[in-house]
Every structure is written in C-alpha cells, then in structure tokens.
Amino acid sequence: MGMGRYQKSATSGVSARWVFVLCISSFLLGVLVVNRLLASFETVDGIERASPEQNDQSRSLNPLVDCESKEGDILSRVSHTHDVIKTLDKTISSLEVELATARAARSDGRDGSPAVAKTVADQSKIRPRMFFVMGIMTAFSSRKRRDSIRGTWLPKGDELKRLETEKGIIMRFVIGHSSSPGGVLDHTIEAEEEQHKDFFRLNHIEGYHELSSKTQIYFSSAVAKWDADFYIKVDDDVHVNLGMLGSTLARHRSKPRVYIGCMKSGPVLAQKGVKYHEPEYWKFGEEGNKYFRHATGQIYAISKDLATYISVNRQLLHKYANEDVSLGSWFIGLDVEHIDDRSLCCGTPLDCEWKGQAGNPCAASFDWSCSGICKSVDRMLEVHQRCGEGDGAIWHSSF
C-alpha cells in the first residue's frame, strides 16, 4: 500500500510541474505577440500622423512606383518592337525579290535571249532607283500616234532626262522587232530612236495577237533594268496627266502588292470572228459568263513585287487572247490588293474637262467606245488643251 501511494503522488507531482511550465510559457508568448502588434499599430499610426514634410522625405527615400506610367512604357516598347519586326520583314521581302530577279535574269542569259543577256551583263551595275517606269505600247505603224504624244504630255529631249533625275520617272515607247530582224521596219525605229531617245526595245516579234506576250516581256525586262516602285503599261492613244498619275501612285507606295487600274468584268466572247474572241471561253464556265475583275488594258500599274513575280514565273504564266485578261489571271490567286481608281479612265471632253474645272483633274482619259481616244492623232492636242493639268504640274508635284 505504501508503494502505491508513493507512485500516485509522484505521478501527480510531475503533471503539476509540467502544467506550471506550460502556463508560464504561454504567458510569455502572449506578451511577446501583444508587444509586436502594438508596435505595428504605432508605426502605421505614425505614418498617418506624419507631417507633409516627413511624408515628402519618405517618398524621396522610397519613391512610389507609377503603375500607369510603367504600363505605358511597356506598351510603347511592344509597339516599337512590332514596328522593327515589320521593317525587317519588308527588308527580307525586298532581298528575296532582288534574289529572284537576279536568278531569273541569269537563267534567261544562259538561254541565249539577246535582250536579257545584255541585262545579265549589266547586273554588276546597280539598277537605278526610280519612282515609276511607264511603258507606252506602240507599233511600227504608229509613228503619228507617238508624235501626237510627244507634242502633248510626254516630255522631250533634256526634259525627259530631267524627269528621270529629278522625279525618278522613266517613260519609254515600248516596241519589239519585226518578223524580219534588221529589215526596213527595224531601221525606221532605230532612226526614230536616234532622234528622240525615248524607246525601250524588247526581244519580241510584234503582232496584234501577241500583246499578252509583249506585256509579259515588257514587265520582265523593265524590272530587270530599273528598280522602281511601280511599273505602268499604257496604250499610245491615251492621254495622261503625269502629276495626277504620280500623286495617285504615291498614295499606295507603302503597299507591297498592288494592282491599280479601272477594274471591269466584261463578257467572255465565245463566238468566232468577233473582236476580243476568247478561244478558251470554256474555262470560264457556261457561255454568257463574265471574266473575273481585272484592270482595263488602256492603262494600269503594278507594284515592284508583282512585276518581279511576272519575271520569275513567266515560263509558267498562261496567256489568254486578251492582254488585260491575261494580266488579271496572273494575279487572281495571289494576295494582291486590287485598286479600282476611276481617275484612270475618264472620258474625253466634256467628262475630263468638267472634272478638271472642278479641281479634280483626271490621271488618264480615253473613249471607251474606241478603247482609246477616238481618232487620237487628230484629237490628242485638243484633249490635252481641255483636260491637261498644265505642262508645269509634274515639276511642281512632290512624290
């Protein structure tokens, strides 16, 4: 019994000591926590009660972060980075275009094409940088048409050279050679070229039914010779205001792939013997269907990338009977912006005259009924006098 009483007392003693220790520990821990909390409250209260001078000093030592300003800086940097990427993309695209052009020219040089072989020999020279190149399509029999243009809207002699150096504009009559090279027709053109210095000769046999081929060769040869923003094709019975044309093109200068003209969609003519007959009419669906939208052939412009595309792929591009349809078909499956600009297809007086008087001179004028100016040799001067923008307009224009 004595032993049991001792064990019970010992057990009770140990428990009491542990309880005492735990109580003291809890008290001390509580005091510590309360002191910490009181210190925090005093700090916050001190900040709130601090004087304006103390607050300013605190801000100077610990400046606040302007989150809105920081967010604006980030957005600005992102925008700048995006612009840099776009510039690099454009540069890479231009280099790819240059490489493709050089390869195509070198390939043609190996094929023995005289016109392009000369271009290959000139590849060591840097192509002149130009605003636009205008090719005026003409024929051996069109001397009077050429003279009517030289006497109106086409600068001559030193003025033509000045146009190139000051405005970056190349203008040439475009013609190939006869079916008998070195014959009378070719000698006549050579003599005319010696006099006016305004021809661009192609390695092409002239013929009315070869206009699609001539157009293709023109763009390929022009892009190999001149590095321009735009390449223009115009017929030799159309009146052009160069200042207005330049201003029109300048609005689209930053776009990589543009096709500018008066867009139309005429009927596909299946009947043989009619003008503009389409032998491959069946490709366009049922009889009576219309062509896809394309620029009318009197005048249109394409950007450098598209001219290069024609040059690189000319062996693969299909030619239809009509030149304007052929050109439109080459772009129909590409990422190209078609720009329908009606200032490029004004009618002759009174239409273009009224628009000029209203302060909106036309870029080009012709008669739809004649697919050009009717009796252009006789009427070109009249159209120029009544619809022209003024001979000095091109020199006062800034592109």
From Swiss-Prot:
Its main location: Golgi. It is a single-pass type II membrane protein. Residues 1-12 are cytoplasmic. InterPro entries: DUF4094 (IPR025298), Glyco_trans_31 (IPR002659). The keyword Acyltransferase does not apply. Its EC number is 2.4.1.-. Keywords: Glycosyltransferase, Golgi apparatus, Manganese, Membrane, Signal-anchor, Transferase, Transmembrane, Transmembrane helix. Its cofactor is Mn(2+). GO terms for cellular component: Golgi membrane. The keyword Nucleus does not apply. GO terms for molecular function: galactosyltransferase activity. It is found in: Golgi apparatus membrane. Pathway: Protein modification; protein glycosylation. Disruption phenotype: Embryonic lethality, due to the arrest of embryo development at the globular stage. Residues 36-399 are lumenal. It holds the Pfam family Galactosyl_T. It comes from the Eukaryota. Belongs to the glycosyltransferase 31 family. Interacts with GALT29A. Beta-galactosyltransferase involved in elongation of beta-1,6-linked galactan side chains on arabinogalactan proteins. Required for the progression of embryogenesis beyond the globular stage. Beta-galactosyltransferase involved in the biosynthesis of type II arabinogalactan. Transfers galactose from UDP-galactose to a mixture of various oligosaccharides derived from arabinogalactan proteins. Forms a complex with GALT29A that can work cooperatively to enhance the activities of adding galactose residues at O6 positions to beta-1,6-linked galactan and beta-1,3-linked galactan. This is Beta-1,6-galactosyltransferase GALT31A. It comes from Arabidopsis thaliana. The gene is GALT31A.
